[in-house]
Amino acid sequence: MIFLDNRQDKIEVTDKLEKIVTSSIECALKEEKVNFPCEISVVFVDNENIKDINRENRNIDRVTDVLSFPMLEYPESKVFKEVYLNYKFPEYDMNDGNLVLGDIVVSLEKCEEQSREFGHSFFRETCYLIVHSVLHLLGYDHTEDSDKKIMREREEYILKKAKL
């Protein structure tokens, strides 16, 4: 189950955007072998809101493009398909039978800025950030160069599969 919550008024959230975001998440989950019914919440915000959330949660007082709030814990350098593929989840990880993976907060205003900066569409930039964030929910990280390379390869693979 994917919940989309628009809390900004700078960028119009169209049916097309909602559909592309949802299909990007579904593709990432499929490609990462998440075979449980699961729940992810996506909150659309503007730059001011994401800056506040970034400061409150990470003590970083600046605008960022996307924030991920995973609900599951992972051993270092392990991802969902390595840890939880055949795992029996306890009830507290579930919500109405859905595995709660976590929350994504994305600044659509920043997506628009970055799409112009990188020379591709707003939809492509938004979906890239959504896939990036889903991978964080699934245990991927990019603090080490080797992990960053793996994560980047997965992002591009998933975007290609999603035809974005």
UniProtKB/Swiss-Prot annotation:
Gene3D superfamilies: Metalloproteases ('zincins'), catalytic domain (3.40.390.30)
InterPro entries found in the cross-reference section: MetalPrtase_cat_dom_sf_prd (IPR023091), YbeY (IPR002036), YbeY_CS (IPR020549)
EC number: 3.1.-.-
CC cofactor: Zn(2+)
Classification via PROSITE patterns: UPF0054
GO cellular component assignments: cytoplasm
One Gene Ontology molecular-function label: zinc ion binding
Binding-site residues for Zn(2+), renumbered to this chain: 132, 136, 142
Family of this protein: Belongs to the endoribonuclease YbeY family.
HAMAP family linked: Endoribonucl_YbeY
Its biological purpose: Single strand-specific metallo-endoribonuclease involved in late-stage 70S ribosome quality control and in maturation of the 3' terminus of the 16S rRNA.
Name the UniProt record assigns to this protein: Endoribonuclease YbeY
Origin species: Clostridium kluyveri (strain ATCC 8527 / DSM 555 / NBRC 12016 / NCIMB 10680 / K1)
